[in-house]
Amino acid sequence: MSWQAYVDDHLMCDIEGHEGHRLTAAAIVGHDGSVWAQSATFPQFKPEEMNGITTDFNEPGHLAPTGLHLGGTKYMVIQGEAGAVIRGKKGSGGITIKKTGQALVCGIYEEPVTPGQCNMVVERLGDYLLEQGL
């Protein structure tokens, strides 16, 4: 399966039991910041934004004082899983990023999608990739 198919079929799909509810944007990005696949709506990000995210996985709490920035949007960092998941909130939406062995699985949402639904979609694919050694 291509990386684009993972984004299209597993991240940008309807959320179980909520037809028509889906993430606003999604991507799979290598640890080096290279985009493996993304939705058409995923924001163009700066290398330093991705560096900040990568640093937070290695040094949990790094982003807390400044917030998580992606594509010029600032998210307030909320409870995640140190070294595994970063979650951010901005207004009625937010972001979930799951780290796998080789990549970062990113999902961005707005209402009516809930934070829990975004977490489920992103982390399910991230866990699958981890099981596959990716």
Swiss-Prot record:
GO terms for cellular component: cell cortex; cytoskeleton. PROSITE patterns: PROFILIN. A motif (Involved in PIP2 interaction) lies at residues 84-100. The modification Phosphothreonine is found at T114. It is found in: Cytoplasm, Cytoskeleton. Binds to actin and affects the structure of the cytoskeleton. At high concentrations, profilin prevents the polymerization of actin, whereas it enhances it at low concentrations. Belongs to the profilin family. Occurs in many kinds of cells as a complex with monomeric actin in a 1:1 ratio. This is Profilin-2.
